[in-house]
Swiss-Prot record:
Protein name: Chromosomal replication initiator protein DnaA
Keyword line: ATP-binding, Cytoplasm, DNA replication, DNA-binding, Lipid-binding, Nucleotide-binding
Record's subunit section: Oligomerizes as a right-handed, spiral filament on DNA at oriC.
SUPFAM superfamilies assigned to the protein according to its UniProt record, in alphabetical order: P-loop containing nucleoside triphosphate hydrolases, TrpR-like
Lineage, top ranks: Bacteria, Thermotogati, Thermotogota, Thermotogae, Thermotogales
Family that this chain belongs to: Belongs to the DnaA family.
Region annotation (Domain II) ranges: 69-96
Annotated residues for binding of ATP: G140, G142, K143, T144
One GO term (biological process): regulation of DNA replication
Main location: cytoplasm
Length: 440
């Protein structure tokens, strides 16, 4: 019966949602026509009740009949002390600076980061409720953004709470300095008594550093036992923190663990648009799409690519078209995605595809408009984009040197006069060259 119910639910949600929200989901008991489900924590319980109530209701009714009901329970962690009161508001103070650009409003949500985003937002709205929150993911996926978004949200909405954002390296350095200066008590007072929300970035930096791990362990316990919120970020999940004390890893896992996955192409496009909005810049849609399609390893590089294009546009006073973007961003594209290509032979094939003229017509002496236009476009792109020599172009297109020079000039003059149709064809040819060069 249990497996039938789970299978019925699974057929009603997509694979991504199942992996994201139902990973800790199970049937705890079936008593008559009532099903009791269990999940890993309160956050998931409330999310499923809010977003998937009808799905669960229909599933249990299909298996047990129309009178079937259900409830969701969660495994609550028992703290070391009996203290369970909400956070007591303290004097208004931000103990460490935060980047004002790192807000929930500026964070673009997609399938790969939805769970982490909503978990962080809930922690910001209800400090101490999901404790600790452990966010992990690869470089440049938004961990620091979410971590500081929590801090910025709390500062704006709960100004009496004391927020501290630190990197693990900063925590280590503070500890070392306090020991050298004989001020260990002041260190412990700072991190254990004078903070309501502790945000720790890059905890993997402490791998192999047993002494500071011990200090972090006791700091964690004291804050948690006092109902203070702890949020930790890492580039890997807790159980993969090698050379970390087991007791500390278990503390990281006892709350809410959320993974950040690389954004899909549509999310990257949305992120790129948001970055443009923040920078108050503009780029053509085809350029933005090119960046999102090809700079896909992390968001820092995506931002770097956009900044480079905007700086070029500002310093030169020129608009950035697709051709220019491809040239400017060659260092941002993964080298293993670039394949060798015969420049002009493949160019002729692409021109034929874009214009509708056959390869034979392009290389013939035909003077019909389609063939003539295609031929001139091919020579222009070969000269200005592929940077081929006039001699090579003449040989490949079966034309004399003067004819090539004249053809390139005619296209250039036509573009200067604002021939939008011709420009569109050339942009399409260049775009196809880049897609082929970057495929695989």
């Amino acid at each position: 019966m249990k497996e039938r119910i789970l299978q019925e639910i699974k057929t009603r949600v997509n694979r991504k949602s199942w992996e994201l929200w139902f990973s800790s989901f199970d049937v705890k008991s079936i008593e008559g026509n009532k099903v009791v489900f269990s999940v890993g924590n309160l956050f998931i319980k409330e999310w499923l009740e809010k977003k998937y109530y009808s799905v669960l209701s229909k599933a249990v009714k299909v298996v047990l009949g129309n009178d079937a009901t259900f409830e969701i329970t969660y495994e609550a962690f028992e703290p070391h002390s009996s203290y369970s009161e909400p956070l007591v508001k303290k004097r208004a103070v931000l103990l460490t600076p935060l980047n004002p650009d790192y807000t929930f409003e500026n964070f673009v949500v997609g399938p790969g980061n939805s769970f982490a985003y909503h978990a962080a937002l809930e922690v910001a709205k209800h400090p101490g409720r999901y404790n600790p929150l452990f966010i992990y993911g690869g470089v440049g996926l938004g961990k620091t953004h979410l971590l500081q978004s929590i801090g910025n949200y709390v500062v704006q909405n709960e100004p009496d709470l004391r927020v501290m954002y630190i990197t693990s390296e900063k925590f280590l350095n503070d500890l070392v300095d306090s020991m050298k200066e004989g001020k260990l008590n002041e260190f412990r007072e700072k991190y254990r008594k004078k903070v309501d929300i502790l945000l720790i970035d890059d905890v993997q930096f402490l791998i192999g550093k047993t002494g500071v791990q011990t200090e972090l362990f006791h700091t964690f316990n004291e804050l948690h036992d006092s109902g203070k919120q702890i949020v930790i970020c890492s580039d890997r999940e807790p159980q993969k923190l090698s050379e970390f004390q087991d007791r500390l890893v278990s503390r990281f896992q006892m709350g809410l663990v959320a993974k950040l996955e690389p954004p899909d192409e549509e999310t990257r496009k949305s992120i790129a648009r948001k970055m443009l909005e923040i920078e108050h810049g503009e780029l053509p849609e085809e350029v933005l799409n090119f960046v999102a399609e090809n700079v896909d390893d992390n968001l820092r590089r995506l931002r770097g690519a956009i900044i480079k294009l905007l700086v070029y546009k500002e310093t030169t006073g020129k608009e950035v078209d697709l051709k220019e973007a491809i040239l400017l961003l060659k260092d941002f594209i993964k080298s293993n995605r670039v394949k060798a290509m015969d420049p002009i032979d493949e160019l002729i094939e692409i021109v034929a595809k874009v214009t509708g003229a056959s390869r034979e017509e392009i290389l013939s002496n035909s003077r019909n408009v389609k063939a003539l236009t295609a031929r001139r476009i091919g020579m222009y792109v070969a000269k200005n984009y592929l940077k081929s020599s006039l001699r090579t172009i003449a040989e490949k297109f079966n034309r004399s040197h003067p004819v090539v020079v004249d053809s390139v000039k005619k296209v250039k003059d036509s573009l200067l006069k604002g021939n939008k149709q011709l420009k569109a064809l050339i942009d399409e040819v260049i775009g196809e060259i880049s897609r082929r060069a970057l495929s695989g």
